[in-house]
Amino acid sequence: MMAASASATTMLLKYPTTVCGIPNPSSNNNNDPSNNIVSIPQNTTNPTLKSRTPNKITTNAVAAPSFPSLTTTTPSSIQSLVHEFDPQIPPEDAHTPPSSWYTEPAFYSHELERIFYKGWQVAGISDQIKEPNQYFTGSLGNVEYLVSRDGEGKVHAFHNVCTHRASILACGSGKKSCFVCPYHGWVYGMDGSLAKASKAKPEQNLDPKELGLVPLKVAVWGPFVLISLDRSLEEGGDVGTEWLGTSAEDVKAHAFDPSLQFIHRSEFPMESNWKIFSDNYLDSSYHVPYAHKYYATELNFDTYDTQMIENVTIQRVEGSSNKPDGFDRVGIQAFYAFAYPNFAVERYGPWMTTMHIHPLGPRKCKLVVDYYIENSMLDDKDYIEKGIAINDNVQREDVVLCESVQRGLETPAYRSGRYVMPIEKGIHHFHCWLQQTLK
């Protein structure tokens, strides 16, 4: 449990600049602003999480149902499918949602509109834009976004699309004084304003106010940068509460830790619907003794506790006192908070990990895992590498499970399943939230 040496840190942080369109916090381009704005950054730095102030910055037993087909993708057919799951049925008697929730392209599109384009979604971490003129890019569904901090320190978010001919404006992350479109050379300030329309004549009267980048709502909450397409969100609201409800303080107590330092990112593409991973995460470790043999030795399952609070499920479990190899990764207790629909914050031992599942299609997603560790452990290269290796292996095992479930859902043999209570109460709660959000 120590801080990694410079060489160890460099070795740990050699990862791609983007992860499924989401920026890698370990990459940073500090080239001169006069360089090509859209060159993919190559330099890497080790971001920290020193700024933890919750700063708010906002811009502008029933019979198995029969399931309808979405061959004709009308709003009524989608809603019919949404209502095939009834949240009023007690979980002991209920069937799980129909397999079509996990396979139909039209249902996936409906999820993007009703879930991912509403409320707050994690876009990146605050250290990516801790300095003026830093920026990063990413994607959410078919939305390409750009987050920047201008020269005066204000944070902005925009659709990453040039207002001239719809070219993607920037890529990767880094530090620049302006954004230059790679197509026709239009120039935008770090605040999204149009600074120059190349070769445009003054008599055309192109209005810079009308041709600036299209803004998104943005907020910084502790280590997380969040964005929103939701126009119903009020300016200046309590971002933590809007995102996490009454669980915000509990999550804040674990995640807003100034001793934590970002050290590594892992990514796991998988051929499965994003909800399969969410379901897997929320089963109160029901699958762990069968699928994760080493991980099972780290936990005392008799102490497992699951609480569902609004749009968050929190799981707590004590670490096992009998560790076969003597390696203590989990510590006294593990805390797992899963914020619906797709983001988890975990604290255990000296670690914090975040798990972000990115929907990429009805049958495809990517898991991005960010690792943080307490400063006192940064020099312990062996501990860090072993801890990351153990957790990465757990995720690879879960990828196999999720892809297997997706294949099973695609077969004509399966329409829906049943819940095993109370261990799967977290999954049932998530499904109820989905139905209420989608209807």
Curated annotation (Swiss-Prot):
Residues 42-54 have a biased composition (Polar residues). Its main location: plastid. Expressed in leaves. Residues 24-54 are annotated as: Disordered. It is an enzyme of class 1 (oxidoreductase). The keyword Magnesium applies. It comes from the Eukaryota. Induction: By salt stress. It is found in: Plastid, Chloroplast stroma. Binds 1 [2Fe-2S] cluster. Belongs to the choline monooxygenase family. This is Choline monooxygenase, chloroplastic.
